[in-house]
């Protein structure tokens, strides 16, 4: 790992104290200045957001997320991948399930290649490669300046190795999940161990102008992050990562059982809801397959 300088990022607004967990979470309000590093110049003049198809998880088991099958309209998960193109550079947010799954029957492809019982399994369906979708809009892996994951779970890091030349933007907690002393080796992102890496703290302004901000929303993982993109025409959006899995999470305030007791996910959701109210941003849940099917996909884009 080539470690770049560590930024201490000034968080927006107040700090909420999680007394039960002894942790701090920053509440986000627009208006403060963030540290950011110099970026390369891209060919576009404005900000663009491309939505790519990173595959589908076929599942009928929302109980793991605190919901029943009767409560969820569509239990399958889309695995969205996002390319943000800014005049100062490019950022890829999440990388999908993995191009290696293209052409494999979904009923023979359990999530994470784990042979789980069919009644509770998630199965993988990938019909197009992320690489080909990027090439269709003129971007090879070598043209991606920065890489960030909402978190390093299998459905978000499947193509990570293809972007090892990019600078990895990550919090220490998630980096330790990937490469720390107790980490389980995962070949899907093994190449990132030698990538340029920026350990970020709190919220992070990627390009230095407030238009693309990684929001620290821990809980699902220690370093989980969501992404704010201030689109001039479409309006601002927040890409949720796995802070929410289903749209019903919003309606019923549900979450995985393991995330309830510490209170960290709850605090991150409160932080994000305050941020949405302040900015008027739309919330995009990357696993919401019904919403994903209605979105514009690359080569179309939001700006």
Predicted regions and their residues:
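Metal-dependent catalytic neighborhoods of phosphoester/phosphodiester hydrolases
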Residues: 158-164, 294-297
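Conserved G/P- and acidic residue-centered "switch" motifs that form tight phosphate/ATP-binding loops
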Residues: 94, 151, 220
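Hydrophobic membrane-insertion alpha-helices, especially the h-region
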Residues: 22-30
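Metallo-beta-lactamase
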Residues: 9, 13, 17-18, 31-155, 162, 167, 187-196, 202-207, 211-218, ...
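Short glycine/proline- and charge-enriched loop/turn segments
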Residues: 108-117, 250-257, 302-303
């Amino acid at each position: 790992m080539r470690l770049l300088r560590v930024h201490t990022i000034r968080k927006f607004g107040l700090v909420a104290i999680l007394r039960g967990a002894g942790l701090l979470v920053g509440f986000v309000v627009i208006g403060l200045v963030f540290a950011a590093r110099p970026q390369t110049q891209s060919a576009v003049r404005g900000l663009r957001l491309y939505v790519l198809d990173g595959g589908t998880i076929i599942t009928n088991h929302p109980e793991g997320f605190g919901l029943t099958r009767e409560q969820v309209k569509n239990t399958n998960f889309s695995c969205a991948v996002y390319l943000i193109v800014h005049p100062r550079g490019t950022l890829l947010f999440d990388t999908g399930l993995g191009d290696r799954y293209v052409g494999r029957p979904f009923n023979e492809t359990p999530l994470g290649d784990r042979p789980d019982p069919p009644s509770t399994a998630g199965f993988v369906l990938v019909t197009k490669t992320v690489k080909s979708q990027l090439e269709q809009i003129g971007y090879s892996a070598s043209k991606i300046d920065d890489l960030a994951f909402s978190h390093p779970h299998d459905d978000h890091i499947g193509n990570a190795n293809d972007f090892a030349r990019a600078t990895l933007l990550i919090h220490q907690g998630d980096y330790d999940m990937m490469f720390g002393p107790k980490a389980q080796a995962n070949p899907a992102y093994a190449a990132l161990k030698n990538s340029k890496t920026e350990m970020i703290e709190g919220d992070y302004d990627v390009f230095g102008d407030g238009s693309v901000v990684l929001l620290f929303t821990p809980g699902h993982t220690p370093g989980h992050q969501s992404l704010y993109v201030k689109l001039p025409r479409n309006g601002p959006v927040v890409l949720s990562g796995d802070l929410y899995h289903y749209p019903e999470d919003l309606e019923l305030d549900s979450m995985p059982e393991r995330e309830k007791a510490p209170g960290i996910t709850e605090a991150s959701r409160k932080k994000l809801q305050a941020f949405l109210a302040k900015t008027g941003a739309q919330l995009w849940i990357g696993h919401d397959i019904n919403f994903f099917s209605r979105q514009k996909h690359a080569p179309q884009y939001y700006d």
